[in-house]
């Protein structure tokens, strides 16, 4: 549905005059195991897609337009694939890279930031993204607890994962992680 803000193009004319590197970019094509659950996390399609997308990583995060620009928040989608595959180590490594590229409220720029350069953002770039903050907050929630598997309409067929991704730095002796009344498909969860 056109917004009225600008003219829309569809079909072949949309790529007319564009260099190929600007088309066919990785975006949400990695959402194969989570949240869609189309494939098992260890399925060849999932693992091959993750491996392919990582080839264009820069500074530890995803890029856009085949490596031309950094893209901070979309990295959360890959982190969730690693999370459900049980690869906590890679999920944490990518998470730390993600938050290194975020502001104090987890906001991030969508793109148009060149890798390994200064942080001067192209003035045509959308302002810091609240969506980045939302995705980061939800990712942290999923590190504490997340639901997965089975039939989403039948809780008894689903699994609840408590603290599936925890950094060793978060579990020092004498300290503890806690959740109080965290909402889930299984009701409110309290854990320490």
Language model feature labels by segment:
Residues 1, 46, 70, 84, ...:
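Extended aliphatic helical segments
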Residues 23-27, 69-77, 86, 128-135:
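Aromatic- and histidine-enriched alpha-helix N-cap/loop-to-helix transition segments
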Residues 89-192:
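Non-catalytic C-terminal accessory modules of carbohydrate-active enzymes
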